Amino acid sequence: MYTRGETFRLKPGQYAAYQQAHDELWPELAATMLAQQVNMVIYHHEGRLFLFATAPSREHFERTHQGPVARRWAEYMAGMLETDTQGHAVVEPLERAFAFGAFAAG
């Protein structure tokens, strides 16, 4: 099992819009994630988002970020997230500090 932790920041005042976007997750994006067996949870704390995801492999996870639907979603999210000079969301990988149980093997 592949696990992934990332953090990124919301633009000021965008938390409600971010939540709504995910409450109304595009069906074609959800279908891609389900097909790749990606499970995900995102937590919020003081303007920072923390993503934790699992997938059968890194390749499965990365496939969810490919194709026109993923590109459109990234462009949509760029309006809510802090971005670099090219307009891409600034995503920082999290180093795993501890794992227990099923996560210890991944």
Predicted features by range, described:
Residues 2-17:
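Short glycine-/aliphatic-rich beta-strand segments at the starts of folded cytosolic domains
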Residues 14-37:
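Short amphipathic alpha-helical segments
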Residues 30-58:
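Short, glycine- and small/hydrophobic-rich beta-strand elements in well-ordered beta-sheets
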